[in-house]
Amino acid sequence: PERAIAYSNKKVVSDEIVDAFTIGEARSFEADPRFGFIVLAEIASRALSPSVNDHGTAINTISSITRLMLLWHNPKSETETENSQSDSAQHEEFKYDRISLPALNVNDLFDDAYTSIARDGAANIEVAIRIQKSLKTIKACFKDGGTSIERDFVEAASKLAKQSYERAKLALDYEDDIKRIERVYNDN
């Protein structure tokens, strides 16, 4: 509240600066990509609660999270990538050279998306397996990427897969279920 969100070394009408920002009491999906993952995780966690007991909704939500995570992976041909990078770099150089944003913390993103579901669904073999498959898909799609964000996605997915596996192993009672989740985890 007490920190400025914009500075200008030119005489600019303050209304122009104020109009460039949206300030509100509620987060929005457009302004905060993590917010969408938090909402999806809350839907899944609520579906896993004893009062609702709807594992199908949790599984569908995990599938939605997977598809959204994969939007960060957009394979293009080298020519397309080079052309789009030079076009966008040139465009950004002139239009947005004074804007800076904090980098997206991939570990926080994965934590928002998976941790509560892994915790609340640890005792359900179907949910535990779906989480493992989701994270395996993400790792497979990002594993050959050369960018730091792709490496961060693989690292975060590996970390969450291990945590989810360990939670499930502690929560599951039936020996065959424990063996199933172990096989799926080790297949990663």
Residue ranges and their predicted role:
Residues I5, N9-N188:
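Short basic (Lys/Arg) and small-residue
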Residues P1-R3:
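Membrane-embedded segments
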